[in-house]
Amino acid sequence: IHRTEKQMIAHIIGDRVISDITRDGISWINERIKRPAYIWWNFPVSDYVRDHLLLGPVYGNDTTIAKEMSGFVTNPMEHAESSKIAIYSVASYAWNPAKYDTWQTWKDAIRTILPSAAEELECFAMHNSDLGPNGHGYRREESMDIQPAAERFLKAFKEGKNYDKADFETLQYTFERMKESADI
């Protein structure tokens, strides 16, 4: 690989088909190609989890490797509109990785993409971000806002104990919001 023409761009996807881009991974490839790699990040592409929308925050890529890359692009989902949150976020990351703010960028993307229903889109996206089990082992966090209540409720249910009313109400409220948000 190191003998390839210097004018050629070497698109690299990371150390697996889908993974976060790490310092170790980019150092490994740069040593072999003898120049900064051009990253083709396989996210939010979802052709291997077609029943999922990947609308959550973009996170996990090293924010200190800008000088080790010659470029950074995203591989979007087959759903153009649904890819916009991630495309916006990846563009922000690629523009200045050191100053990339996962949550602020995600919220900015949502407000930019659908300003008339940003709250609804945020609710829908918050609960549509994980890939689910897949052959690549790549996962994203999902429904973090209700995770503690959901875990406590599920534990009580499995143990045949009474659930906490506040947890139930939190989950019920969120599920109603999710239903309404999906219908905008």
Question: Model-derived features: where do they sit?
Answer:
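Catalytic-core regions of glycoside hydrolase
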Residues: 1-103
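C-terminal functional modules
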Residues: 99-184
